[in-house]
Amino acid sequence: MNKILIAAASSGAGKTTVTLGIMQALKKRGFAVQPFKVGPDYIDTNYHQAITGVASINLDSFLIDDDEMLASLFQKHGESADISVIEGVMGLFDGLGTDRDNASTSFIAKCTKTPVILVVDGKAISTSAAAIVDGFNRFDPELKIAGVIINRVASENHFSLIKGAIERYTDVPVLGYLPKNAAVALPERHLGLVPQEEMTELEAKWELLSDLITTHVDLDKLLEISKSSENLSTSKAQMKVADFSGLRVAYALDAAFHFYYQDNLDLIRLTGAELIPFSPLEDNEVPEADFIYIGGGFPEIFAKQLNDNRSMRKSILAAHEKGIPIYAECGGLMYLGSSLEMEGKQYEMVGVFNGISKMTTRLRKFGYCIAEPLEETLIGKKGMSIRGHEFHHSVFETTETACMKLSKKRDGEIVKEWRGGYQKGNTFASYLHIHFYQNPAILMQMFGAGKR
């Protein structure tokens, strides 16, 4: 199985840009590329899929606290491709707390036995780049840097200085560089990168990136490195789940709601349930279903359109009142509230929960956390431990009673606790994004309610 992992010394060094360029260049050479993303991010994976035509898979060792399961999922998705390309997250050794193996890119590299290509930001640096590469190469004896790509290089002469220094002071090969070019920059939004659905002229960007990578990076050497990787020897069986054949699961899928982990959707299909997409923006009503799943996204950007689609809002509220189970994450919670406040205006939402979502100018919650239901809920029984991730700028002001205790830990110590998550009838909503592969009991609890 050929594989590489694109990592960086820090966030903002150019991992995504380099990764996308490599994916496009490999695709143009005729390779079938399977993309992966370290961590819980939903947005970079949209870019990956736009280029490769294949769903990108999240590899997150916090959300799935089972090394063998992670390796098994990686193997399952990558074995039929010509090459697997993993995009890292943050800096190579950054994760949860100070443990370099806790939810970090480096841990995923070791778990999947994948060679690491380090992206170094070349802006305003020359010989010091060698110190960065040498330090990263020595930091973990179990992990070696297989190659380096320099980003944001000012000129050929600038690249020669950096390359010469790295090759003089380390034994890590320099595979090439990307020149500074504003045309390949990706604009940002409050949740990170702008979703692919709203980008224009994407194909031109991908083509430019591909041309730059092909011109300035030794792709043959990169492919050689990918072939030198160790094979995985994982025998972990796929998660055993109950049979829910015949269960109809309607899930929101449009520009406002599209944050879903591909493995979650695959696991739903593995139960035998039927996934039926619908659009809260465009459709008149929710499809006839036994279960409704509303993922995250950007309801605030489409608040007026969601407000104006009264028939859809009424049909979801009617489904709730009939007792059809509804599970909603983050943007889904905002949609199920009474209203959404955006730029001083209020827009009516579904109204399952009595609460107003208000957008703020900063991140309100960010990062991994552990949730514990304080009562029986749609996603878990009282006292159950559920791993998740929150990332949002909105606050949900409500009179509803929260049904979960949430906490953040750093290096074994609880650093923050709060309450969240709301259960009303058979409807559950929270800001928490979860991965179903962490525990089969979560999906069984949810679909069990839909089957009754």
Curated annotation (Swiss-Prot):
Protein name: Cobyrinate a,c-diamide synthase
Domain spans labelled GATase cobBQ-type: 248-441
EC number: 6.3.5.11
Magnesium listed as a keyword: yes
Family classification: Belongs to the CobB/CbiA family.
Gene name as annotated: cbiA
Catalytically driven reaction(s): cob(II)yrinate + 2 L-glutamine + 2 ATP + 2 H2O = cob(II)yrinate a,c diamide + 2 L-glutamate + 2 ADP + 2 phosphate + 2 H(+)
Pfam (any one): CbiA
Cited Gene3D superfamilies: 3.40.50.880, P-loop containing nucleotide triphosphate hydrolases (3.40.50.300)
Pathway membership, UniProt: Cofactor biosynthesis; adenosylcobalamin biosynthesis; cob(II)yrinate a,c-diamide from sirohydrochlorin (anaerobic route): step 10/10
Note: The a and c carboxylates of cobyrinate are activated for nucleophilic attack via formation of a phosphorylated intermediate by ATP. CbiA catalyzes first the amidation of the c-carboxylate, and then that of the a-carboxylate.
